[in-house]
Amino acid sequence: DSDESRGLGDVYKRQELTGGHPNSLGNTIKVVEHVIVKKNRINSLIKCYSSTDQIVRLRTSNAFKRIFRQKPEWFLDFKHIFLNKISKIKQSSTQWTCAQLFSELVNQLENKEQKKAKKIVSDYLNNSSDWIVLCQSMNALITFNKIDNKTIKENIKIIKKLSKDRRKAVSRLAKKLLSLIKE
């Protein structure tokens, strides 16, 4: 009996990734431990991104960060899904997760994929008001800038705007990016 035929995506949604306090991990660690044993279980976890429950999607994102940090080589088989589908989900936790994954696993992205990831992160900077999305996107730009030193300059307008943001975490990081240009 395969995991797919048993509908583990539904099990994750119903039993493991729902309920509890919205900011808690719930049973995310348990899901990670289950998936890490058998790579094909990722397919069931990916299905959780289609849940209408934003807490399920938040915990799914958290699970993927943990899985890919433990098994970074697994990202190779799923990067296209994150670049082409997951990154388009209009939820802050999903967006900051994509920014983090693209930054942390940039060495697994081919040149064309790096450009796409950079565009996604730039779009997040220009369209999000969530401070975590903004900070993780700027952190990703720092990483991309090490590969292509035009990255920060290409986003200078939004970075200058963010350097005046009322939220200290956002403005401080934007100022750091501006200082990288001057070096």
PLM segments and residue spans:
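Alpha-helical scaffold domains
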Residues: D10-E183
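Single conserved hydrophobic/aromatic residue that forms the stacking wall/gate
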Residues: D1-Y12
